[in-house]
Amino acid sequence: MPGVETIKSSWADEVELDYGGLPPTTETIENGHKYVTEYKYNKDDKKTKVVRTYKISKQVVPKTVAKRRTWTKFGDSKNDKPGPNSQTTMVSEEIIMQFLNSKEDEKANDPLLDPSKNIAKCRICNGEHWSVNCPYKGTAMDTNLMEKKAAAAASAAVDAPKSGKYVPPFLKDSQKGGMGMRGRDDTAAIRISNLSESMTEADLEELVKKIGPQSKMYLARDKNTGLCKGFAYVHFKQRKDAAAAIEILNGHGYDHLILSVEWSKPQNN
């Protein structure tokens, strides 16, 4: 007896027999791919099967982005699937943001790195560096500076009063002008004006230490802010060094200001 041949029907006929309408959409994940199967009617009013294949890939994102993707949707998109919906969301071009390092911001706001506030000023070439680091140190430019210092010292020695009379040692200090009850000698003291607010005692010492030895220095500061008031007094051990300081520093540019240096006027006790 010949075998009964079974006639295989198409999948569309089987679906039509099993379901009265369109079957539900199914999703399956295999080998790193996602398969979405949907059923719909075409323009000829026939059932069609549409299979979409998606490749699953892992992406490392910031924690804030991952947390934002878990937010619950609301409104018209309340029942939407994860991800953007083309009917309610328009995806624009990707914008890449570059975040600056906080250390770069601190460096930009550091007042010590501001070139307009550079306190270093060379006495030899007027450059923005200390005199000890001057590339012209020991050259003809440095020699001219030393000649000015020697000329100022010589003029101070000529102006000093000369007398052939014997003066006892205990009376020598009393004959110096400006010597008060406290033993302060104002004849070798100078007043430096037009200093910047950022001036410090170390800067003042660096400014005058190569001219000659000093006995005392005083930088006037504001009691409330602690900033320099704009002037200072320097007492040299020898009057010729004080005269040399006036000759060299008066009119000298320092910290973007022009210094004014003169003899300190004796105070009336």
Curated annotation (Swiss-Prot):
Compartments, record wording: Cytoplasm
One Pfam family this sequence matches: eIF3g
GO biological process: formation of cytoplasmic translation initiation complex
Database matches in InterPro entries: eIF3_g, eIF3g_N, eIF3G_RRM, Nucleotide-bd_a/b_plait_sf, RBD_domain_sf, RRM_dom
Keyword terms: Cytoplasm, Initiation factor, Protein biosynthesis, RNA-binding
One of the record's GO molecular function terms: translation initiation factor activity
Task performed by this protein: RNA-binding component of the eukaryotic translation initiation factor 3 (eIF-3) complex, which is involved in protein synthesis of a specialized repertoire of mRNAs and, together with other initiation factors, stimulates binding of mRNA and methionyl-tRNAi to the 40S ribosome. The eIF-3 complex specifically targets and initiates translation of a subset of mRNAs involved in cell proliferation. This subunit can bind 18S rRNA.
Subunit field text: Component of the eukaryotic translation initiation factor 3 (eIF-3) complex. The eIF-3 complex interacts with pix.
PANTHER family recorded: EUKARYOTIC TRANSLATION INITIATION FACTOR 3 SUBUNIT G (PTHR10352)
Name of this chain's protein: Eukaryotic translation initiation factor 3 subunit G-1
